[in-house]
Curated annotation (Swiss-Prot):
Gene Ontology biological process terms, A to Z: glycine decarboxylation via glycine cleavage system
Example GO molecular function: transaminase activity
Lineage, highest ranks first: Bacteria, Pseudomonadati, Pseudomonadota, Betaproteobacteria, Rhodocyclales
Job description of the protein: The glycine cleavage system catalyzes the degradation of glycine.
Domain of life: Bacteria
EC category name: transferase
Stretch forming the signal peptide: none
Protein name: Aminomethyltransferase
Organism in which the protein naturally occurs: Dechloromonas aromatica (strain RCB)
Enzyme Commission no: 2.1.2.10
GO cellular component: cytosol; glycine cleavage complex
Swiss-Prot/TrEMBL keywords: Aminotransferase, Transferase
Subunit structure comment from the entry: The glycine cleavage system is composed of four proteins: P, T, L and H.
Pfam families found in the cross-reference section: GCV_T, GCV_T_C
Length: 363
């Protein structure tokens, strides 16, 4: 039996094509994935991300707990509403999950974890609270009486559309810089996203989600499915958990070194392994020079040895096939490499691992 978000009926009313996404009944598109992708790059689109799991972390030892739990340093969170992207690691330095941590007060944080990893993440967090004997209470907000719905509104016109539909939120959100959140009435509005565009991710009581979804649609915001979400995040060079990294992959090998704070005395789970092992691979982009489509798990042949594509697809913005790949150290941006596509060695160019943001190509 597939799990359903609070917006399931709304998707079906809009004739969405539904698919099994990690055990969730989710919309892959509402007609044209390309049109949905372009709507976000050029105007505004909205996504149901209610399958993601908000987790409230409350208690006197919140900071101590989070400083030991993740590789990024929560000491950076000094202003209420500030968010931090972080990786939660196992003892071997592999990525259990990537998540966003919101600082609200010194005794109240909110974490958003991935849909498919929510159960294992919660179990890991609870185990660490017990092991470290900390005054921390962890409450998931996806399933149950106090569950939240989440709608991501993304694109250059996203803010204007949100203010049109929720005018009472404008004063608190107009000045939000990237990776900040504000609470207005029952809405938790964050200037975050997974598309490379401006916009908000809005959490609200689950019972309010369908009304907001329909109001946004009536205001001209295009509903977008998982298909467009994937090509948008790929163009933006954003990792997908389970594809670009997992529990066997170090954040240093997944292009996430910028989220790892090693230069302090702070200890965290997985730190010793990262220090011992260092970086073994590098995370770069590819653009296919021959005809074909780059896909995950295709082998990449370089002068320094073999690598592997972790995510690949056709880019609607570049009109080329692009990929993210884990490649040997020593490979340089601009190098020409070969990709094994159905037994044929096709040429590709190595690029930085970001292709398009803010409505245009950056390659």
């Amino acid at each position: 039996m597939l799990k359903k978000t609070v917006l399931n009926a709304a998707h079906r009313a809009m004739n969405a094509r539904m698919v099994d996404f990690g055990g969730w009944d989710m919309p892959v598109n509402y007609g044209s994935q390309i049109e949905e992708h372009n709507a976000v790059r050029n105007n505004c689109g909205m996504f149901d991300v209610s399958h993601m799991c908000p987790v409230d972390v409350v208690g006197a030892d919140c900071r101590t707990f989070l400083s030991r739990l993740v590789a990024n340093d929560v000491a950076k969170l000094k202003v209420s509403g500030k968010a931090l992207y972080a990786a939660m690691l196992n003892e071997a330095g592999g990525v259990i999950d990537d998540l966003i941590i919101y600082f609200l007060t010194d005794t109240r944080f909110r974490i958003v974890v991935n849909a498919g990893t929510a159960e294992k993440d919660l179990a890991w967090m609870q185990a660490k609270v017990a092991e470290w004997k900390l005054d921390v209470t962890i409450t998931q907000r996806r399933d149950g009486a106090n569950n939240l719905g989440i709608i991501a509104v993304q694109g250059p016109n996203a803010r204007a559309k949100v203010w049109e539909v929720l005018p009472q939120t404008k004063a608190a959100t107009a000045g939000l810089k990237a990776f900040f959140a504000a609470e207005v009435d029952q809405y938790f509005i964050a200037s975050t996203g997974y598309t490379g565009e401006d916009g908000y991710e809005i959490m609200m009581p689950a019972g309010e989600a369908e009304a907001l979804w329909n109001k946004l649609n009536a205001a001209g915001v295009a509903p977008c499915g998982l298909g467009a979400r994937d090509t948008l995040r790929l163009e933006a060079g954003m990792n997908l958990y389970g594809q670009d990294m997992d529990e066997t992959v170090s954040p240093l090998d997944a292009g996430l070194a910028w989220t790892v704070s090693l230069n302090t005395d702070r200890d965290f789970v997985g730190k010793a392994a990262l220090v011992t092992n260092g970086q073994q691979k590098q995370f770069l982009g590819l653009i296919l020079l021959d005809k074909g489509v780059l896909r995950g798990h295709q082998k990449v042949m370089t002068k320094q040895g073999d690598g592997e594509i972790t995510s690949g697809s056709f880019s609607p913005t570049l009109q080329q096939s692009i990929a993210l790949a884990r490649l040997p150290l020593g490979v340089q941006i601009g190098d020409e490499v070969e990709v094994d596509i159905r037994g044929k060695a096709l040429k590709a160019k190595v690029t930085k691992p970001v292709f398009a943001r803010n409505g245009k190509a950056v390659i």
